[in-house]
């Protein structure tokens, strides 16, 4: 971890007996939680970190082989918890990081009291028995567009994912953090995420899971959250919030933050109501 600590920006703030660890998704960094953190610091110890490859990290140290699968990110997360001597945490992961939490919790279930999964998907590409929202050809076209002109790709991709136009603050913020990534790293991470199939991991998860997503998300159809719920190995609950876009914590914080706070503070009860 000492080497990892030099590469990944880890921030620990707040006070409280319980620890909340926040993991961000593709194209963002820990700043994506800026609307949530002020509501946590009085009651919780809060840990924020940047995934390797995110803008604030040193691109020269990005290991393309290590991060060609989510296990690399999961090992980083476990190393952070070990270094900070965290023996139990509430883990809130967005998109990519929600599945990182899934894998890490399989390796070390004792370290996680629960997972909160925001805009999560175990597979983005459709299969015969599964609707992920994309065809392989869609991903190939997006990858090609990224490779051809990264800046132009961001201008088209960011509004679609956020669910707004280029003038919106959330789209501008997502565009900024996307642009901060080195293009070849962004392309590698994009391909890793959009071609993985982690469905087989779900049944091995024993930690309670809170699954939250927007009612309209271009990247994650509502059916995906229900699929996760039905296939997890432990207790789980789904909440679909009346927001649009893949990053509701950024685009609609007034709706999303109260929901996240409720799931952080309340556990799943026997009647599956948070």
Swiss-Prot record:
SUPFAM superfamilies in alphabetical order: alpha/beta-Hydrolases
Family indicated by similarity: Belongs to the AB hydrolase superfamily.
GO biological process: response to strigolactone
InterPro entries: AB_hydrolase_1 (IPR000073), AB_hydrolase_fold (IPR029058)
Name of the protein this chain belongs to: Karrikin insensitive 2 receptor IA
Pfam families: Abhydrolase_1
Known role: Hydrolase involved in the olfaction of sesquiterpene volatile organic compounds (VOCs) during volatile plant communication in a MAX2 proteins-dependent manner. Acts as a karrikin-insensitive receptor that stereospecifically perceives and binds to (-)-germacrene D, particularly in stigmas, and triggers a signaling cascade influencing plant fitness, as the result of reproductive organ growth-promoting effect; this process involves an interaction with MAX2 proteins (e.g. MAX2A and MAX2B) and the subsequent degradation of SMAX1a, a transcriptional corepressor.
Activity-regulation annotation: Hydrolysis activity toward yoshimulactone green (YLG), a fluorescent agonist to strigolactone receptor, is inhibited by (-)-germacrene D and GR24, a synthetic strigolactone analog.
EC number: 3.1.-.-
Swiss-Prot/TrEMBL keywords: Cytoplasm, Hydrolase, Nucleus
Knockout consequences: Reduced stigma size with normal terpenoid emission but reduced seeds number per flower. Insensitivity to (-)-germacrene D volatile signal leading to unchanged pistil tube size and lost (-)-germacrene D-mediated SMAX1a degradation.
EC top class, as a word: hydrolase
Gene Ontology MF terms in the entry: hydrolase activity
Underlying gene: KAI2IA
Induction per the UniProt record: Accumulation in the stigmas is inversely proportional to the quantity of volatile organic compounds (VOCs).
GO CC terms, sorted: cytoplasm; nucleus
Cell compartment(s), UniProt: Nucleus; Cytoplasm
Domain of life assignment: Eukaryota
Signal peptide annotation: none
Record-annotated active site: 95, 217, 246
Tissue and organ expression note: Strongly expressed in stigma.
Oligomer and partners: Interacts with MAX2A and MAX2B in the presence of (-)-germacrene D, thus forming an E3 SCF ubiquitin ligase complex (ASK-cullin-F-box) containing MAX2A or MAX2B and KAI2IA recognizing SMAX1A; this leads to the subsequent degradation of the transcriptional corepressor SMAX1A, thus triggering the activation of a downstream signaling cascade.
């Amino acid at each position: 971890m000492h080497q990892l600590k030099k590469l990944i920006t880890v921030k620990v703030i707040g006070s409280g007996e319980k620890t909340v660890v926040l993991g961000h998704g593709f194209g963002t960094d820990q700043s994506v939680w800026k609307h949530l953190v002020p509501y946590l610091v009085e009651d919780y110890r809060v840990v924020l970190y940047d995934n390797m490859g995110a803008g604030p990290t040193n691109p020269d140290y990005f290991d393309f082989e290590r991060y060609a699968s989510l296990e690399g990110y999961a090992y980083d997360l476990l190393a952070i918890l070990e270094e900070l001597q965290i023996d139990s945490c509430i883990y809130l992961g967005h998109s990519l990081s929600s599945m990182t939490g899934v894998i890490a919790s399989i390796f070390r279930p004792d370290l996680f009291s629960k997972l909160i999964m925001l805009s999560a998907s175990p597979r983005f590409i459709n299969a015969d028995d599964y609707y992920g929202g994309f065809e392989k050809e869609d991903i190939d076209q997006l990858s090609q567009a990224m490779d051809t002109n990264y800046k132009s790709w961001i201008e088209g991709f960011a509004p679609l994912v956020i669910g707004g136009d280029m003038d919106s603050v959330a789209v501008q913020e997502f565009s900024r953090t996307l642009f901060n990534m080195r293009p070849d790293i962004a392309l590698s991470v994009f391909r890793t995420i959009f071609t993985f199939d982690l469905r087989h991991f779900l049944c091995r998860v024993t930690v309670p899971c809170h699954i939250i997503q927007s009612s309209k998300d271009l990247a994650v159809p509502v059916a995906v959250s229900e699929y996760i719920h039905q296939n997890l190995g432990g207790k789980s609950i789904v909440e679909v919030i009346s927001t649009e876009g893949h990053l509701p914590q950024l685009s609609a914080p007034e709706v999303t933050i109260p929901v996240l706070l409720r799931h952080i503070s309340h556990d799943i009860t026997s009647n599956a109501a948070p």
